[in-house]
Amino acid sequence: MSTFTAYLDDQDLIRIQKGEEHILPFYLKTNQGHLALIPVKTSSAATDTGDYFLSPIPLELGEEYTIYDATGNSSILHYRNIVRKPIFDQTFTYSGEDLGSFYTPRQTQFKFWAPISQDVSLHIEDQVYPMNRTENGGWEVLLKGDWEGAAYHYEFRVNGLERRIHDPYALSSLANSGDSLVIDRKKITRPIRRATRQLDPTEAIIYEMSVRDFSVQKEAGFKHPGKFKGLTESPQLNSEVLGFDYLQKLGITHVQLLPVYDFGSVDEEDQWKAYNWGYDPVQYNVPEGSYASDPNDPYARILELQDTIDTYHRANLSVIMDVVYNHVYQADEYAFEQIVPGYFYRYNAEGERTNGTFCGNDVASERSMVRQYIKQSLKQWVSLYGFDGFRFDLMGILDIQTMTEIAEELREIYPNIYLYGEGWKMDTGLSEDQLAHQYNAKRLPAFGFFSDNFRDTIKRTLVAGHRRESQHSANDFANILTANVGKLGPAHFTQPQQAIQYVECHDNATVFDYFQLEKEEIRLEDRKALSRLALHLVLLAQGVPFIHAGQEFYRTKGLEDNTYNLPDSLNQLDWTSLPKCQEEIAFLEELIAYRKSQPLLRLKKGQEIRDYCDVKWLSDHHLIYTIEKDREKITILVNIGDQEQTYQHPSDSQLLFAYPHANLQVPIPKGKELSIPAHSWLLLHETKSAK
């Protein structure tokens, strides 16, 4: 029985954690049976389990070793800190993109990266095939015959323990992250039909929604509730069009889907037992089975997602995928943790996993095989499914080099791809200058960032009913309306496409609920007016507007702040609200159409904003926001207070928007006094005569 445990912490450093009894010296035995004495370099007896540090000659990484003491007690030499040393990546970076299973009717090739494993075998359809070690930690086996649809997994020994995992490079699996399935890639490879008009990022209007929330409401009458197929349905309710046709009518340009990869916590064979948004990744390259018609069919989840995206493309709607490469679900059980313990995550100086994500683990994107895995995964989602962009959850956890390479390699596949994410600064064990957070935006010109400055300023100021921030601060209305590019405050972003302007998303309370939570005695009409104003400002600001599904018809989640695992009754889109909100929706459709037709509302360059935009407070309760270029001028008057405000317009103009009226084209003569209702805004347009 072993009285100590041995760890390989560097190529020439073994650490012995000894038990109550130990007898020197120590010996190292290779799996070929060779025995060598290892001298003690230093020892520590500060505790009852003091350590010995041994200095063997540099070991051949990947082999299995055993350490003995003088009485024959032994311990497998565990690969520990060595897996996070540069020598490990230098030795075991596998550069090929052929990991996984590759099928033809005559044979299927299986390749698996497991650099410190022994006795690796493929288990397929109740048969076992030993795999052969190749270069850089790879293993492979070639099976003759037709294996299409076959279920398989890998078994191996690592650090003395037997392991069994699915294939982390697989494209399909049995339900609930079960065995991987052999796929004929020819059956899932198709021409990608993109939206006809390719847009600049500032022309995008993003609409965030969940596959499940979109179609689960019983009263709405979807035939495939909670499924990929439900995303393309257009039922009617009281003659009002719902679903897919509603999205087209609204006029948005992009939909952002909450996670659609295989995630944990929802039973794919009985999805109604539990609800989850899906921010708990299990298989990054496999679509979520609970959204498929049959989670055990090798092709259903793949083809149904492909068909959905193609349908959106045919309707000139682009599709963005919400991806979560910053942490995994159940870190100890995750495939790469089973393959190379301690490699896939970041650790602090005490040898504990960092937890910047607050999910128990932070993915170490800077490590060679992790970086390669993330890039390959993203490229498959673009080339096989046709995704038009990615929203990176907790992007500030990921490193700049990885994100830069992602942008470069994805643009080689699809030049117009749009990339953005949550750029929060988080403590994750890497220096801040290495991380892809919003304060490093200048080094990440290819990425957009959710603007918490915009979100918080709009919501808090509207609750207060008066100006809150000092002039030229990062959170002043003047700065956030101009995309924080430095016109009227600190330059947070370099270009407007980096500013994702939003006040509501799946996280936190909806705006409609927020105003109730902040002002318990608020009247319903004021709650609605503030919610409308917040949404409209998203579309009037420079940058990229982002709308949470249902926000336009006062989405509520029962005043809950975090509904990631709460019932469908709270998370579902309430389509029955549509008939009651026709005035609001019709106005929003007109505002969206106007933004799409008016280049001044979506300037493409930071310098243009600095040259053409201005924002001034007329009082503590209302402001004027102007965009003037050449002979054209837009004037937007915003009243954040609960009392009517007035403004005397200095030139001849046309009043275009005054809620609930749009496209008014009402002449406004010079000097006319305008009334701006509480919690509302006006938009005027003028074209100056040529000199």
Summary of predicted features, one role per range:
Residues 2-3, 104-111, 116-118, 614-650:
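Carbohydrate-binding surface patches
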Residues 26-28, 110-112, 117-126, 644-661:
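Beta-strand-rich binding/interaction modules
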Residues 112, 154, 209, 257, ...:
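Conserved, mostly hydrophobic/aromatic
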Residues 149-150, 668-691:
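C-terminal beta-strand-rich structural cap/linker in extracellular carbohydrate-active enzymes
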Residues 212-385, 405-414:
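Substrate-binding/active-site clefts of carbohydrate-active enzymes
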Residues 543, 547-560, 570-634, 643:
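Glycan-recognition and catalytic regions of carbohydrate-active enzymes
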